[in-house]
Regions:
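Short alpha-helical donor nucleotide-sugar binding micro-motif in glycosyltransferases
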Residues: 318-323
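Aromatic "clamp/platform" in nucleotide-sugar-dependent glycosyltransferases that forms part
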Residues: 331
Length: 588
């Protein structure tokens, strides 16, 4: 089967990591899978980058205005304190359906595509009539723009009065949800959710009422993320084997929903236990952290072992193996990669029972699930596992067994394969085509051998009419005004630089004139018969502008004392030329 997979970024974040795993496992099952993305991974052979095709200047200006208004400014300037997770209306994107690139494929799998594909662009891909599977890494495919709703259930209604926006004069989230319900309601468009929780939310939204929602858990490399000897793993990262360790990590620890503040409270509650306090005082406990750390962690009064961003699976597996407990204090989450990875490495997790986490963690069996964001209860659970090695080891074994049973790569790939076949996709055996097939005509090749396709940005008709069209035109006018302001500022800056250069040159001229022999020789004359120019260097005040300095130079050059010394200056120059000619042997 020929499958095109779409994702904004092939390298960073949990969604791209899960996407790459699925691509690898589908490829191992014999399918030809290409990744189409904005930010390619140079390590991936079948990775096509999308670059913007330049239109005429007026069209480009309007496209840029649409991006700034709908994809950037409107939301950014109105965000409330409810959440700092990305909010992407997904209204402007690249038009790939007409590029010729997609003709050779049998099916399409669309992952995290904010700032890449728009709602309307996805609908155009679906209009090609081939199976389209939208893999849900968060809630964005079925909300008015939020990637996580922060507890709001507006997606089940109409997304009006969005709590993540302070004000919403265009009622944009409501319009986005309406467009999704209209454009994604096709029998060949199916959503795949990794967890029952996310699948239930997607079904509740009504966005996929035609193609439906299927639950297929994500997967993990069970041959890479494996249990290791904890003493050896601790030694490998520079720790004493006897130290108790708890691990916290996320790609972006500053994201509010990841619960970093909860972790700080958990650590504080743990200090109430005399045994933990004794370990802390003696250096017998360490907090391990990876990802983008925050200053608050250092303020916890625990010894911190910051592992930074880890982009190597072997090093990451070592970090998990070095931990006695993995702490997952998220407020909102789907099926965190870090949870699966920790469990695969035999490290029991302690997490809040949010989102899809209870699908994987069975409380008291392969980890602990804490309800209600009770940080004191989470602290007690972490403490118990740190101080009861036998119980932690039993949970570790159960965690590994759960991963081996439900989350291997091939199991996820087989389920996707069955879904695509059920949606009417052609099997690999029935499509013997040359690699990339008729899509070759749409491809360009870089000097480094990489492949890319050029596609224009597309602004849907829905945004060019009515109140949205009015707002877009106002944004275009504002962009024009801002561009003119930038041009004028550049002109002023250049003028100021020229003025500074002229002023410096005049300073040098004045310095030379006022220290010349002609000027010094007539000092007595000036004191008696010629008064200095008021406000000049010759008087008491320093000139403040190039115009004043120029006037001063001209006054000096036309002064009586300067003119009286003209014959002497001419005689001096003649003598100087004569002396040079004598030295050069030009005069015998």
């Amino acid at each position: 089967m020929r499958i095109a997979v779409f994702g904004t970024d092939a390298t960073h974040g949990g969604a791209s990591r899960a996407m790459r795993r699925l691509i690898a496992s589908l490829s191992r099952r014999g399918h030809a899978v290409d990744l189409v993305c904005l930010t390619p991974d140079p390590r991936m052979a079948d990775c096509l980058a999308v670059r913007r095709r330049v239109k005429s200047d007026p069209e480009n200006a309007m496209d840029d205005a649409a991006v700034r208004l709908f994809n950037e400014r409107y939301v950014r300037e109105r965000r409330s304190a409810v959440s700092n997770t990305l909010f992407a209306p997904q209204l402007i994107g690249y038009a790939l359906a007409d590029s010729g690139l997609l003709e050779a494929y049998d099916a399409f799998n669309i992952h995290w595509v904010s700032h890449f594909l728009s709602i309307h662009g996805i609908a155009e891909i679906a209009a090609l009539g081939k199976p389209v599977v939208l893999t849900l890494h968060d809630m964005n495919f079925f909300t008015g723009g939020c990637h996580y709703s922060a507890g709001c259930r507006g997606y089940a209604a109409d997304c009006r009065d969005c709590p993540q926006l302070r004000d919403d004069p265009l009622e944009l989230p409501a319009a986005v949800l309406r467009w999704k319900r209209r454009l994604y309601a096709e029998p060949n468009v199916t959503a795949v959710a990794p967890t029952r929780w996310l699948g239930g939310c997607a079904a509740e939204s009504g966005v996929f009422r035609e193609g439906g929602v299927t639950v297929i858990p994500n997967s993990i490399e069970t041959d890479v993320f494996v249990p290791g000897a904890k003493d050896a793993a601790k030694a490998a990262i520079g720790l004493d084997p006897g130290v108790k360790t708890l691990l916290f990590g996320a790609y972006n620890n500053d994201e509010h929903r990841k619960g970093f503040d909860h972790l700080a409270e958990v650590l504080r509650h743990m200090r109430a236990d005399a045994r933990i306090e004794a370990l802390r005082g003696s250096g017998g406990i360490r907090v391990l952290a990876f990802g983008r750390s925050t200053p608050d962690l250092a303020a916890s009064d625990y010894p911190i072992h910051d592992l930074g961003l880890i982009d190597d699976d072997i090093r990451l597996a070592t970090a998990y193996a070095a931990a006695d407990v993995f702490v997952l204090p998220s407020r909102e989450d789907n099926q965190p990669n870090v949870m699966l990875e920790a469990m695969a490495c035999g490290t029991p997790p302690v997490a809040f029972g949010v989102g899809g986490i209870p699908d994987t963690i069975t409380d008291g069996v392969n980890g602990r699930v804490i309800q209600g964001f009770d940080t004191a209860a989470m602290a007690a659970a972490v403490t118990e596992l740190l101080l009861a090695p036998a119980r932690a080891a039993a949970m570790a074994r159960a965690a590994r067994e759960a991963i081996e049973e439900s989350y291997p790569l091939d199991l996820q790939a087989a389920r996707y394969e069955a879904l695509l076949q059920a949606m009417g996709a052609k099997t690999a055996a029935a499509t013997e085509r040359v690699r990339r097939g008729v899509a070759d005509a749409a491809l360009s090749h870089g000097r480094d051998g990489s492949c890319f396709v050029e596609a224009p940005l597309s602004v849907p008709v829905d945004l060019k009419t009515g109140v949205y069209g009015f707002a877009l035109n106002q944004q275009a006018k504002l962009d024009t005004a801002e561009a003119e302001l930038r041009r004028l500022r550049a002109v002023v800056h250049q003028h100021e630089r020229e003025q500074e250069a002229l002023s410096a040159r005049l300073d040098a001229i004045l310095f030379g004139l006022t220290r010349s022999t002609s000027w010094k020789a007539t000092r007595t004359l000036r004191g008696g018969r010629e008064r200095a120019t008021p406000g000049s260097r010759l008087g008491t005040d320093r000139p403040v502008s190039a115009r004043q300095k120029l006037a001063e130079v001209m006054t000096l050059l036309h002064s009586t004392s300067w003119e009286m010394m003209a014959p002497l200056r001419l005689l001096h120059r003649a003598a100087d030329r004569l002396w040079r000619r004598l030295r050069e042997g030009l005069i015998p």
